[in-house]
Amino acid sequence: FSVRESSQLADIHYTRQGDPLGLGHAILRAKSHVGEHSFAVLLGDDIIDARDPLLNRMLEIHQQTGDNVIALLEVPAEQISLYGCASVTATDSDSVIVTDLVEKPAPGTAPSNYAVIGRYVLRQEMFQILEQTAPGRGGEIQLTDALQYAAKHTGIAGGVRGVIFTGRRYDTGDKLDFIKATIKIASDREDIGPDLKEWLKEYTKSL
C-alpha cells in the first residue's frame, strides 16, 4: 500500500457531532465549512466500489438539473424497513424524480422497494431546511425528513432526484457485515485476491 501526505489529497477539516442526534444534525455541524456551495455527503459505513462511478453520475445530474440527488438501491421487501424509502416517478434519463420519502417504514407500509443509501449531493439550502426540521424517528433530526420537505416544496431548495444504483456496494453497519465486506473487497484485488481465494478454499474445508 502506498501512503501519501493528506495535504496532497484534499483540504481536510473535521468537526465533532457530540451527541448522536441524527444524520441531519451531523450534517448541520458542517455548515460553516460548506459555505454557499452545494456539497456531497458520503456515509462511511456504506462502501461503494470506486469502479462504479456513482458519485460522479450524481454530480452530473445535480449540475444538469440543480436538484438535490440521492442514491437509491432496490432491496427485497423484507429489508426496506431498515432504510429510508423513496417514492419515485420515472424520467427519460437514468435518474428518477423523488416525490416522497419515509424513514424506516413499518413492515408492509413502504411505498416502494427503493432504499436510500449513503450517498447524497445536496444544495446549500438544505441547511436551512435541516435547521427547521423537528426531531423525528428516535428523537433525531432525520435527513430523510428534510429531503421529504424538499421533494414536496421544490421552490425552496430544489427538487430531489434519485440515481438507482446497481453496482458493487458493501454495508459495514455491523461487525459481521464489516468482515464480509473486507473479505469481498480483498478477494477482488488483483494483487492479493488470487492468494486470498486459495486460502479461503482451504480454510473453509475445516469448518
Please identify what each model-predicted range represents:
Residues 29, 49, 56-57, 152-153, ...:
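Alpha-helix boundary/capping detector
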Residues 1-3, 98-99:
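Short, flexible segments with low predicted structural confidence
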Residues 196-199, 203-207:
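Intrinsic disorder at enzyme termini
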Residues 40, 59-63, 92-198:
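Catalytic-core segments of class I nucleotidyltransferases/pyrophosphorylases
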Residues 2-88, 124, 130-133:
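Conserved beta-loop-beta/alpha segment of the NTase-like Rossmann-fold superfamily
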Residues 8-9, 14-15, 21, 28, ...:
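Mixed-charge, polar/low-complexity N-terminal
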Residues 1, 189-193, 205:
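Short, structured coil/loop segments at alpha-helix boundaries
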